[in-house]
């Protein structure tokens, strides 16, 4: 679609780029009110006019405020008597205070927003500037000048300003209009697969003050923020088209980017303190797709689906019978989660690959295809690192980009860089494959591409850096999301040993990726024995201090799906699990309790005796029963029953019945890596 501006911009979730309403702060005296206006007018007077778009509008308004600032200077001169204004004068100054706040907010907003987005809104924003001048004119018209002891010069300035404001008309610079037309024509041409002329692109971005790769990168970030702030599909599509234009222009005009030496992945969810309201009551993990059940409780869709499909007809949290099994999306909560992730610098896929995402506009898709084609052609030249980094960043951005990159044949070309001796190139290559693997159909492409899987495994085992190894582990985690591939990966000894070694030897972030990948692979029962033989219990035990949540989840999954060999391997961890129950977070405490329940059921009295020997274990169990999560309380109650039967000497069947609780395998919100 061509971007048009025939109608005002739609409502937005944050403060819009329009003037709004403000309440004047309560000031105790006329002197304080005058001083407040003096400070506000001088603050606005010191502001720089907008540099490229709407410059004349902002400059004119700032100059008008400068005239007012000189008047307030005179009003604050020392006087022999207390300043007392009439009621009408006081009200006029309060209204002027509100206008000042609105002027500052509008100029601030225009300075922060994307320049391209501002260009598309010039008619609306120009109206906002004119509206402020009109409001200022109204206040000046009714201002009782005779109430103030002003010099003739000051009164002349007020009269001059009043006339300027009353004569003001809405104005849009013809150069801004022409520049906007160039942008919209360029985007419209893409719809018909007409490649933009490079000289036209250079002229557009130079006129916007975006004349290098860094400024275009910043513009992309501002446009991505704009997409988050818009609430209707039309505006989101317009912003997406602009992002496509800037990405393509940045690449073809200034070449592929080179990553900074200290370039790192975003913060992960495991490092963040997730608000309780954002956690699913079943898994206690960040909800990816929150939905509301019949009782009004909110759960993550995947978790509650599994609960219902397992035959339960009650609400997990309240225990009430569900009158129906319909799930209503909680979009308000999802938006809050997305905003929180953005504030925490945690990438989060706003929609899954399966649906719910607005159909991408044709212009954005065409820009992406053109950019991918340009980058793939560049892969054969010497500076491959910059090209692969650009593909990495593009694959991180959205579903369309992942599909376009894979369809263009990038995966076989990336495979050859997995064995490179250049550490940064290896990291970029494996991370690009990782980001591509998020798309379901790309998992098949990766698994079927000659050398791709073996290349990733080799990076896992002998990568040049811990980051490369960690991203290889994360790639295996992603591929293991398909059941058939999970079995195939689990049969490869190099995968099993590589993940266990990384969990034992790597730094904390790398251990986390390894443990999460192991957790996904042991979801397949036939893989459990191989991991036990490779020493997964020892690796998990060593990680209890650094990564208790992931380590306990791995132990729980292995014990639950493994046989006596798995239980025996976990025997040495019983006391550690008891310590986690005492001091861990809610999610790890209940996971530790569930692990001990499974071990007691499968292992008999010897395991119960070992648990009973933990100092203060009964008190810990009682605390979980009384103050833990619902699932944790049930597991703790089961442990107490085991302890009582053991204490009573009932060793014939210590593994008495335990309530079967169906809980989804702990999952990781998997996000693209930049």
From Swiss-Prot:
GO molecular function, one term: ubiquitin-protein transferase activity
Repeat positions for ARM: 399-438, 441-481, 484-523
GO biological-process terms attached to the record: protein ubiquitination
Pathway assigned to this chain's UniProt record: Protein modification; protein ubiquitination
UniProt-listed CDD domains: RING-Ubox_PUB (cd16664)
Function: Functions as an E3 ubiquitin ligase.
Name of the protein this chain belongs to: U-box domain-containing protein 16
Reactions that this protein is recorded to catalyse: S-ubiquitinyl-[E2 ubiquitin-conjugating enzyme]-L-cysteine + [acceptor protein]-L-lysine = [E2 ubiquitin-conjugating enzyme]-L-cysteine + N(6)-ubiquitinyl-[acceptor protein]-L-lysine
Domain U-box intervals: 273-347
Domain of life: Eukaryota
Key words, A-Z: Repeat, Transferase, Ubl conjugation pathway
């Amino acid at each position: 679609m061509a971007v048009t501006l025939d109608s005002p911009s739609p409502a937005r979730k944050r403060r819009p780029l329009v003037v709004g309403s403000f309440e004047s702060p309560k000031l105790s005296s006329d002197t304080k009110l005058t001083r407040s206006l003096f400070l506000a007018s001088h603050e606005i007077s010191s502001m720089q006019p907008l540099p490229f778009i709407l410059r004349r509008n902002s400059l004119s308004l700032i100059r008008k405020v400068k005239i007012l600032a000189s008047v307030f200077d005179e009003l604050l001169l020392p006087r022999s008597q207390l300043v007392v204004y009439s009621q009408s004068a006081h009200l006029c100054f309060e209204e002027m205070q509100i206008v000042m706040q609105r002027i500052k907010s509008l100029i601030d907003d225009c300075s922060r927003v994307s320049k391209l987005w501002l260009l598309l809104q010039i008619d609306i924003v120009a109206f906002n500037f004119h509206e402020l001048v009109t409001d200022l004119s109204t206040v000046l018209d009714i201002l009782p000048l005779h109430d103030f002891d002003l010099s003739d010069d000051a009164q002349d300035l007020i009269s001059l300003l009043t006339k300027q404001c009353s004569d003001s008309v809405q104005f849009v610079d013809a150069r801004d209009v022409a520049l906007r037309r160039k942008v919209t024509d360029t985007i419209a041409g893409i719809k018909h697969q007409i490649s933009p002329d490079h000289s036209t692109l250079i002229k557009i971005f130079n006129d916007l003050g975006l004349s290098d790769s860094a400024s275009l990168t910043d513009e992309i970030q501002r446009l991505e923020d704009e997409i988050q702030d818009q609430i209707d599909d039309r505006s989101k599509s317009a912003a997406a088209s602009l992002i496509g234009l800037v990405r393509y222009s940045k690449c073809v005009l200034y070449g592929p980017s080179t990553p900074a030496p200290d370039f790192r992945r975003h913060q992960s969810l495991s490092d963040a303190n997730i608000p309780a309201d954002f956690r699913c009551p079943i898994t206690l993990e960040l909800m990816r797709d929150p939905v509301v059940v019949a009782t009004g409780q909110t759960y993550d869709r995947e978790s509650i689906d599994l609960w219902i499909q397992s035959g339960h007809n009650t609400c997990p949290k309240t225990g009430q019978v569900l009158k129906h099994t319909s799930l209503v999306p909680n979009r308000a909560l999802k938006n809050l989660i997305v905003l929180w992730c953005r504030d925490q610098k945690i990438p989060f896929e706003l929609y899954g690959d399966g649906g719910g995402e607005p159909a991408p506009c044709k212009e954005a898709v065409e820009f992406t295809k053109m950019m991918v084609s340009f980058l793939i052609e560049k892969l054969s030249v010497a500076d491959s690192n910059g090209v692969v980094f650009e593909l990495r960043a593009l694959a991180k951005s959205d579903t369309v980009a992942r599909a376009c990159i894979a369809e263009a044949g990038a995966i076989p070309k990336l495979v050859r860089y997995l064995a490179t001796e250049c550490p940064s190139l290896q990291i970029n290559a494996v991370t690009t494959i990782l980001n591509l693997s998020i798309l379901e159909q790309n998992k098949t492409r990766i698994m079927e591409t000659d050398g791709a899987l073996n290349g990733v495994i080799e990076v896992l085992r002998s990568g040049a850096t811990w980051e490369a190894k960690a991203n290889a582990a994360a790639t295996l985690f992603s591929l293991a999301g398909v059941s058939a591939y999970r079995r195939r990966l689990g049969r490869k000894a190099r995968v099993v040993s590589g993940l266990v070694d990384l969990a034992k030897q790597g730094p904390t972030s790398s251990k986390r990726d390894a443990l999460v990948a192991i957790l996904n692979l042991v979801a397949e029962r036939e893989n459990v024995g191989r991991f036990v033989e490779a020493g997964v219990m020892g690796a998990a035990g060593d990680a209890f201090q650094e990564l208790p949540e992931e380590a306990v989840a791995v132990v729980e999954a292995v014990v639950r799906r493994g046989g006596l060999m798995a239980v025996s391997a976990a025997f040495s961890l019983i006391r550690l699990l008891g310590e986690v129950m005492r001091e861990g977070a809610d999610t790890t405490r209940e996971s530790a309790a569930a692990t001990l329940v499974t071990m007691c059921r499968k292992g008999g009295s010897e395991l119960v005796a070992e648990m009973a020997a933990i100092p203060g274990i009964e008190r810990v169990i009682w605390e979980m029963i009384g103050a833990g999560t619902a699932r944790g309380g049930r597991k703790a109650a089961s442990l107490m029953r085991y302890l009582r039967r053991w204490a009573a000497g009932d060793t014939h069947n210590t593994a008495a019945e335990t309530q079967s609780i169906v809980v989804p395998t702990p999952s990781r919100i998997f996000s693209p890596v930049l």
